[in-house]
Amino acid sequence: MGAPPQAPTRNVIANHDVRIEVLAQGEERGRVIVLLPSLGRGASDFDAVAERLAGAGYRVLRPQPRGIGQSRGPLAGIDLHDYASDVAAVIAHEGQGPAFVVGHAFGNRVARMLATDRPDLVRAVALVAANIGKAPSPPRVRQAIRNSADSSLSEAERVEALQFAFFAPGNDPRGWLEGWHPEVLQAQRIAGDRTSREEDFAAGRAPILYLQPDHDPLAHVADATAYKEQFAERVTIVVIERSSHAVIAEQPDAVSAALISYARELWPDESGE
């Protein structure tokens, strides 16, 4: 029998007038992997992935976005630079050197902005189910995301929206009926719209792992291919089968394996320690 999974500790980090709750687990002196969640959702979405990364010897940090858990800060009049600054404060506070920053869906834009604004804090980024295009998602997709988070709708309506926007055929979306923060979702969407997609598009000069679901209505395989063509050797693409936009919930083993494999390339001859 292996050791039981380590429960994360919870700390609050100050970033000027902002307070960011951080879930931390794994080797305290291990190489740092930071996990950033999707639009309107929190750090718990990464529970299964974080456990696997910590078990591989890495120090795993999960900052809660503003408005979730104990994280507090302005939600109006901000943009992606502000969200990236929150994550920068977390990495700097940890003091273990540049981190491998993993962004799921909306979190991928925050990861790319952080790599642009603070390259000294970013060893590499992973873009997970990334809508990498320079235009916003189509109206039907945006509406499905709103419906997924809208507790005033019937369960059947929300399941239909979740299945369309987030889950591949055959994958049960009902686990994502919970975990939504509509006010945070709206604030993050406005912040994203206030930020030109040109600003974060290239992720600075960081190496990029691109985890591409094979059934994603928001993040298309063709977009991943075009992104690699533009940035060449900086980009490594891994397609995650039988998954859609909620890939970290649908295929946590495959996502974790890809992240661990890439981390071992970033830090050769180490297992996180």
Question: How would you name each of these model-derived features?
Answer:
Residues 15-25:
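A short loop-to-beta-strand scaffold at the N-terminal edge of the catalytic core in hydrolase folds
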Residues 55, 62-102:
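Active-site loop/oxyanion-hole signature of alpha/beta-hydrolase fold enzymes
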